[in-house]
A protein has these predicted regions:
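Alpha-helical residues within the helix-turn-helix
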Residues: 97
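Low-complexity, small/basic-enriched stretches
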Residues: 1-62, 131-154
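Short, leucine-enriched amphipathic alpha-helices that occur as contiguous helical runs
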Residues: 70, 74-78, 105
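Short amphipathic alpha-helical boundary/capping segments
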Residues: 64-70
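Short helix/strand-capping hinge loops at secondary-structure junctions
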Residues: 84-87
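Short Lys/Arg-enriched helix C-cap and helix-to-coil transition segments
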Residues: 119-126
Length: 154
């Protein structure tokens, strides 16, 4: 069973989607499911609580049930993103090297763009090789905000 619920946050409206007890989507984009119940569940409520703590500077890691849905390559990239510590960044090239596919820099960028679990799977922590902010599916202004919040952008 799919449940989803939208909250207002400092980044605007954020929708959380849960399937069978695990989060599958966290997005700031409009979310229109084919099926599902618009209902706040314990998992969704906990995800919002942890995200609120993150926004207020009280949380650096998330402890939530996640179900990553994507290609094997995408899931490999997203698993690598989960290992980037709070307050640190990595380049797309570094992620490609981490997953053992150093020539897949553009593919890493595409996997980042398809990340369904914003913030919790921290694709915002991936920057260009030159240290510049590039590519964030929901806007570079939000990426900059998140990196400043984490202290990795001064």
């Amino acid at each position: 069973m799919t449940h989803y619920y939208t909250y207002d946050t400092i980044l605007g409206s954020v929708t959380f989607v849960e399937e069978n007890g695990a989060l599958v989507v966290i997005t700031t984009r409009p979310y229109h499911p084919k099926e599902g119940i618009y209902q706040e569940t314990p998992v969704i409520k906990e995800a919002f609580r942890q995200l609120s703590e993150y926004f207020s500077g009280k949380r650096k890691t998330f402890n939530l049930p996640l179900l990553l849905k994507g290609t094997d390559f995408q899931k490999q990239v997203w698993q690598a993103l989960l290992k980037i510590p709070f307050g640190e960044t990595r380049s797309y090239k570094q992620i490609a090297e981490t997953i053992g596919n150093p020539k897949a820099v553009r593919a890493v960028g595409m996997a980042n763009n398809k990340n369904p679990l914003l913030i919790v799977v921290p694709c915002h922590r991936v920057i260009g090789a030159n240290g510049k902010l590039v590519g964030y599916a929901v806007g570079l202004d939000k990426k900059e905000y998140l990196l400043r919040l984490e202290g990795s952008l001064l």
